[in-house]
Amino acid sequence: MITLGIIGVVAAMTMPSLIANHKEKETVAKLKKVYSTLSNAYLLAKEKYGTPENWELTEYDSPEGADNALSKLAEFMNVAKYCGNAPGCYTDVDYRYLNGQKYNYSIDNNTSYAKLILADGTIIAMNIREPDCKQDRGDSVVLKNVCGTFSVDINGPKPPNQVGRDRYGFILSKYGIIPHGAQLETMFSFETNCKDKSTHQGFGCTAWVIFNENLDYMRCNDLDWENKTKCK
């Protein structure tokens, strides 16, 4: 009986850790899948329509431009529901930043975003930054030719509904899809928008999760791309 009791205590102690580890691996897999989906759609849309500055993006924050761009990409994705600029796709739930503060912004009701839901439940919203694809967001040719951005919820309305945990972002560049927080990005860098969960909003976490395959920024605040990509 004593042995069984010890086993039960050990199981109770280790089970939460195992569940958390499984959920983290699931998050990594889902986010990498979204990255692949967007990247493949970009390549196929580029082949059919040319680079994004030729997709009739019209102007900054243009509802028509966002719909023109996302509808072209949607041709090459497994879409369950396409909302365009109308509400009904991007779940209007209470999101929070990585630091726990409330995210007071409704994408679902914002017509400058075009929205869709993939067959696997992923929600994607897109808006236009520069119709000529020349917005500067970093120190590379790709990041100096930004056309628009994507906001992604990898599990729809399910919790935690938090930036950096199930809500992430990507960039549409003239030259491809870039995850927010990429090493050369300056607008939403990992160092200033993800590294410290107590103060940062979490918009710079996407690239870290994809390339380092962890959410260790939830457990320590001294990570960096070159010398420490895991807490332990």
Feature-to-residue mapping (PLM):
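Membrane-proximal N-terminal amphipathic helix
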Residues: 24-54, 59-64, 69
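Intrinsically disordered, low-complexity regions enriched in Pro/Ser/Thr/Gly and acidic residues
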Residues: 62-232
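Contiguous, often N-terminal, cationic amphipathic patches that form binding interfaces
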Residues: 2, 8, 42, 46, ...
